[in-house]
């Protein structure tokens, strides 16, 4: 399925300077103080940490992130510390080099071992990359060419398919914190020409040692953004994996995205559309799509109301093919995206064999506080593959609040309620409601 010509094209782009997509790349600096480094060099210390308290009432669910089956404990704590350095070195009229090195330590307390990493801790390298970007050379526009290689991040769109380069929980701890975002190895190139961006990439995920499928992908991404409110995207990726994920080895994925505010005189109205097709013969033939419409009110607290409908195909056991959508490397872009539900999406539902309706209301009482409510209605796409006769999984209501205390500290609160539907009753013989709460403190410097 994979063309040799496509491989050559990707290799050619990667070998040419192109733009990286690492999180928070070191900005260009014109400061005279070079901290004792050669002229044109600058560096800074990077430090962040987080600590959370989590509690379940009537806990049940298992970790769909890494296919681990285990009930949750009622209460647990987890935290992380990340420290490192990042820097740049300007080249006379030839752009600049940039890079970073960092490490992450994580710890989880009082949770059963397989799920969120009970009494588990780890420390390892996180960022370790070197890149080059063109600056304003050749008159092509600021950083029109960029290339980066090493342990770095890459994020595609709003994260439905590719967003998180590192697995959490299990033997590493830090299940919810998500401090590990860098891929184990990445080579990323980007060329920007006006509103058009072309990327080529190779990504090898940093998976948990106990469930390492050696999953990797290479691909190309094209985006066209005619302003900050309107972007169209198209991506092709080809995948490899070992025997733990046979359906992923040889998989081809096509993805189309649109983030639109189509009426210039009505910027309060916005749309998001995304479609993905997965093809690996009889091993996997599936699709997923979602559509969102949002309305931003021009009033106190600036409330935004949105509705999203999402479908992730499930397997039909009556066919020879496997139609169960592979959620790949999804991640947290915003509350509700793409872990769907602070109970369901975090702890027992995956983006496969799932239909979800989401209604969200978000408000900002002031510049320091963002808060909202998210209501979900979950259904199975195919009941037979789930081993039940009802498609009604249940409904969930989440409340969240992010309080930015100052430039360094942010505190997040979550309270969630899940009422199980008939499908959960049939699968687990449980019909009690579920409750969940969280307080998380994050620090960055």
Give residue spans per PLM region:
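Internal metal/ion-chelating core segments
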Residues: 191, 195-264, 268, 273
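Outer membrane beta-barrel
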Residues: 79-207, 215-219, 223-226, 231, ...
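Active-site beta-loop-alpha junctions enriched in small/polar residues
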Residues: 50-52, 152, 203-205, 237-239, ...
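Cleavable N-terminal export/targeting peptides
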Residues: 1-35
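A short local loop/turn or secondary-structure capping micro-motif enriched for an aromatic residue
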Residues: 206-208, 241-242, 314-316, 380-382, ...
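Beta-barrel outer-membrane channel/assembly domains of diderm bacteria
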Residues: 22-147, 187-193, 256, 263-270, ...
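Flexible glycine-rich, low-complexity coil/linker segments exposed to the extracellular/periplasmic environment
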Residues: 318-353
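Short, well-ordered secondary-structure micro-motifs
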Residues: 245, 317-320, 383-386
